[in-house]
C-alpha cells in the first residue's frame, strides 16, 4: 500500500456546527457538501467527519445506536454517499469517526443484552455482580464523572467508561469484533478512505477488574486501568489483518493514555497496526489531570514544558512511527481565549501557534474555524450544552464541593469542549451565516469581526497564512520527512528547531 497519508493535511468537521442547509439550526451533510470548495481552497487533502451515525445524541453522536444508518438531522445514507463522491471529485479524501469502545444504550445489541443473563447478546457488554454490600464491582470512575458502573434490573452492573448511556463493548467476545469489522467494511466498500478511531486505546479491558489503590478521598478513580489493556495491540493487529490491510486507507487512533513507547507500538509499520495516534500530553500542560478535579484543576502554562513534550514525541517517533500535529479539535477548547485581544494580536498569536507545530514531522490537523482564528466563547454556565461540563459541575461543585462555582466557571471558560462546538462563523449576519433558523448552540459573540467572509476579503488574514503554510508543506519534502532538532531548549520565548532531509536544512524560528 502507498503512504499517501503522510503528505496529507486534514480538516476536521464537527457537522452539527459546520453549516445548516435546511434552516433547522443543526448542521447537516448537505451543508458540508455546499462548503467543500472552501475546504479545497484552504488546501486540505483529507476531511475527518465527526460521527454522523444514528444516535440518541447523549454525547453528540459519540453514542451510536446504528452504525449503518445516518442520523436523520444530518441527512440520509444517500446524502453520505453523495458527500463521499463530491469529496473524491475534488481530489480529496474522507475519513469517518469509528466509535467502537462503546455503543449507545439504545443500540439493538444492548437492548437485547440487558434483558437477561442468558441472552445471546449478554456478552456483547461487560456485566458484573455487585460487591457483597451491593455497591459497584470496583472503584473505577467514569471519565464523564461518577462511577463507571450502572445497575440494571438483572441485578448486575454494566461497565461504561463515559456516560451511563455509553456501555462499553466487550472486545473479548469474538462476535463483537466481527460486528465491528463488518461495519467498517460496509463503509469502506462505499468509498470511505479511513478512520479516526475514538478512544481506541480503551478497547482492551483488565478483565480481573482490580480496584485502584488511592490515597485520597475519591470514591471513584480514573487511571491506568482505563487504557492500554493486555490485548489492545492484539485486537488492533487483528483489525488490520481483517479489514485495514485490504484498503489503501488512513488510520488515526485516539490514545490519550499512551506515552511515546506505547505510541511506537501503534505506529511502527512493521507491527501492522495504525498510521498514527492522537496524544493529549501537550494539551495537558496547563492542567493537573491526576488531581481529584481532573482537567478542571488549572495550573500556569509552561512554554518550556510544551517544547520539551513536543520534542520528545518528535524524536521518539522519528524513523519509527508517525505523529499527529494539532492544538484544536472537538474535545479541546480554542487555543485563543475569549477576551480583549486585538485583531492584530489574535493574528500574531494564531500564526505563532501554527508555526510551532505545522512544520514538525507528522500530519497537520486543522479544526473547523481554527483557520479564521475563532476564539473561546463567552457564556454563563447554564448555557453550556456539553454533557462533560454538566456532570463535572454536579460532581465537583454540588456533590463533592472540591471546587467553588467561580473556580469551576473560570476553568470551563478555558477548558470547556463547547468552545470548539459553537457554530462555524461564515459571515457577520444573524447566527454567523451558519443557519437561517435558531442555532442549536449559542453563536460566539465575536462572529461579526471573526468570520470566513471577513477572512477571505483580507489578504493578510489567518486563513491565507494557513493556506501559505500548507502550500509550503506540499512544496518542501523536508517539512514532511525531515529529521527534527530543537534549538534553545530552555528559552521560554522562542520555539525554534531545525528540520533536515537529504542534505536540505530548514530553520523554523
Curated annotation (Swiss-Prot):
EC number: 3.2.1.10
Keyword vocabulary terms for this entry: Cytoplasm, Glycosidase, Hydrolase
Cellular component aspect of the GO annotation: cytoplasm
SMART domains in alphabetical order: Aamy
InterPro entries in alphabetical order: Glyco_hydro_13_cat_dom, Glyco_hydro_b, Glycoside_hydrolase_SF, O16G_dom_2
Record-annotated active site: 198, 254
Superkingdom of the organism of origin: Bacteria
Disulfide bonds listed in the record: none
Gene3D superfamilies assigned to the protein according to its UniProt record, in alphabetical order: Glycosidases, Golgi alpha-mannosidase II, Oligo-1,6-glucosidase, Domain 2
GO terms, molecular function: alpha-amylase activity; oligo-1,6-glucosidase activity
Pfam families: Alpha-amylase
Keyword rRNA processing found: no
Catalysed reactions, semicolon-separated: Hydrolysis of (1->6)-alpha-D-glucosidic linkages in some oligosaccharides produced from starch and glycogen by alpha-amylase, and in isomaltose
Location(s), subcellular: Cytoplasm
Annotated site residue numbers, Transition state stabilizer: 331
Listed GO biological process terms: oligosaccharide catabolic process
PANTHER family registered for this protein in UniProt: ALPHA-AMYLASE FAMILY MEMBER, OLIGO-1,6-GLUCOSIDASE 1
Family per record: Belongs to the glycosyl hydrolase 13 family.
Name listed for the protein in its UniProt record: Oligo-1,6-glucosidase
Organism: Bacillus sp. (strain F5)
Amino acid at each position: 500500500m502507498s503512504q499517501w497519508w503522510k503528505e496529507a493535511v486534514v480538516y476536521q468537521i464537527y457537522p452539527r456546527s459546520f453549516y445548516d442547509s435546511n434552516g433547522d439550526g443543526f448542521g447537516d451533510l448537505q451543508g458540508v457538501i455546499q462548503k467543500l470548495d472552501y475546504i479545497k481552497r484552504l488546501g486540505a487533502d483529507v476531511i475527518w467527519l465527526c460521527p454522523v451515525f444514528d444516535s440518541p445524541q447523549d454525547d453528540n453522536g459519540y453514542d451510536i445506536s446504528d452504525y449503518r444508518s445516518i442520523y436523520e438531522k444530518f441527512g440520509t445514507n444517500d446524502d453520505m454517499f453523495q458527500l463521499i463522491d463530491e469529496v473524491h471529485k475534488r481530489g480529496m479524501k474522507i475519513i469517518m469517526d469509528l466509535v467502537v469502545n462503546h455503543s449507545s444504550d439504545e443500540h439493538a445489541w444492548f437492548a437485547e443484552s440487558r434483558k437477561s443473563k442468558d441472552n445471546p447478546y449478554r456478552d456483547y457488554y461487560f456485566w458484573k455482580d455487585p460487591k457483597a454490600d451491593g455497591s459497584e464491582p470496583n472503584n473505577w470512575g467514569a471519565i464523564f464523572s461518577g462511577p463507571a458502573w450502572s445497575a440494571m434490573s438483572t441485578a448486575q452492573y454494566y461497565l461504561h467508561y463515559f456516560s451511563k448511556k455509553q456501555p462499553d463493548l466487550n472486545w473479548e467476545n469474538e462476535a463483537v469484533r466481527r460486528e465491528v469489522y463488518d461495519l467498517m467494511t460496509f463503509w469502506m466498500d462505499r468509498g470511505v478512505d479511513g478512520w479516526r478511531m475514538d478512544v481506541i486505546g480503551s478497547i482492551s479491558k483488565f478483565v480481573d477488574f482490580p480496584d485502584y489503590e488511592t490515597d485520597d478521598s475519591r470514591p471513584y478513580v480514573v487511571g491506568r486501568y482505563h487504557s492500554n489493556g493486555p490485548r489492545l495491540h492484539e485486537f488492533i493487529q487483528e483489525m488490520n489483518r481483517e479489514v485495514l490491510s485490504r484498503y489503501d486507507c488512513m488510520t488515526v487512533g485516539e490514545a490519550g493514555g499512551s506515552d511515546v513507547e506505547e505510541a511506537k507500538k501503534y505506529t511502527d509499520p512493521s507491527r501492522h497496526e495504525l498510521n498514527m495516534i492522537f496524544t493529549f500530553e501537550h494539551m495537558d500542560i496547563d492542567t493537573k489531570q491526576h488531581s481529584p478535579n481532573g482537567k478542571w484543576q488549572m495550573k500556569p502554562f509552561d512554554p518550556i514544558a510544551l517544547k520539551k513534550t513536543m520534542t520528545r514525541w518528535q524524536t521518539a517517533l522519528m524513523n519509527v512511527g508517525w505523529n499527529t500535529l494539532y492544538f484544536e479539535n472537538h474535545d479541546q477548547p480554542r487555543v485563543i481565549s475569549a477576551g480583549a485581544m486585538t485583531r492584530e494580536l489574535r493574528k500574531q498569536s494564531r500564526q505563532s501557534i501554527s508555526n510551532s507545530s505545522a512544520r514538525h514531522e507528522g500530519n497537520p490537523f486543522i479544526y473547523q474555524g481554527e483557520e479564521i482564528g475563532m476564539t473561546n466563547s463567552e457564556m454563563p454556565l447554564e448555557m453550556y450544552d456539553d454533557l462533560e461540563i454538566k456532570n463535572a459541575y454536579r460532581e465537583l461543585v454540588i456533590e463533592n464541593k472540591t471546587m467553588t462555582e467561580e473556580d469551576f466557571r473560570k476553568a470551563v471558560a478555558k477548558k470547556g469542549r463547547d468552545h470548539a462546538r459553537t457554530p462555524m462563523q461564515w459571515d457577520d449576519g444573524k447566527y454567523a451565516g451558519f443557519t437561517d433558523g435558531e442555532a442549536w448552540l449559542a453563536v460566539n459573540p465575536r462572529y461579526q469581526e471573526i468570520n470566513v467572509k471577513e477572512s477571505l476579503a483580507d489578504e493578510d488574514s489567518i486563513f491565507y497564512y494557513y493556506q501559505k503554510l500548507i502550500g509550503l508543506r506540499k512544496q518542501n519534502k523536508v517539512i514532511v520527512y525531515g529529521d527534527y532538532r530543537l534549538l534553545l531548549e530552555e528559552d521560554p520565548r522562542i520555539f525554534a528547531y531545525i528540520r533536515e532531509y537529504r542534505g536540505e536544512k530548514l530553520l523554523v524560528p
